[in-house]
C-alpha cells in the first residue's frame, strides 16, 4: 500500500513504498487476529487481497518480489528448513495471484522473500543464499540477483542463532544510506562488527 507503514506478516511485496495492495495468505483467516487486521484495513481504506492456493501463512517468503517499477521477480522457493515439510512449500505462485497483467521474471536461484530487503538502489541478503545455491559460484549468484532485481547486492553474515537465515529479522531499510540493525552488542559483538563491515 503506497505510503503505508511496512507490514511484515504474510505480505507479497518486499518494497512497500512501491505497492498498492496488501496481500495475505488465506491461512490468516484461521487466526484470531484476522478480524482486527481486517477492521484496520477497512477503516483505513487499504486495499487487500487473500491469496488462494497457498500452503503456508508466510506469503512474504514465497511470493514474487515486487521491483520499484511494478514488475515482479519470481524465484525458487525450496528452503532447507522445509525439506521435511514439502506440503508447506508453495511452488506455483501463479495459482495464488493473477499475474497476467504484470511482468514477471523467473530467477533460477533458491531463496526466501524474507531474506530480501530492498533498500533503494541496493538489496540486502544474508549469506544463506550462498549456502542454498552451492551448485553456483558466489559471482554467478550475485550477478543473477543483481540483474533480476536491478540493484546492487549487499551480503551480510547469517545470524546462525536463527535457522531461517532471513535478513528481515536483522536489518530494516529506513532511507538512503540508513538501515536499522538488531542490537547485537550484548549477544554477538563479532557478528555485529561483520554486519557493519558488510553494510559500509
Q: Model regions: which residues?
A:
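The feature marks the mature, well-folded catalytic cores of soluble enzymes
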Residues: 2-200
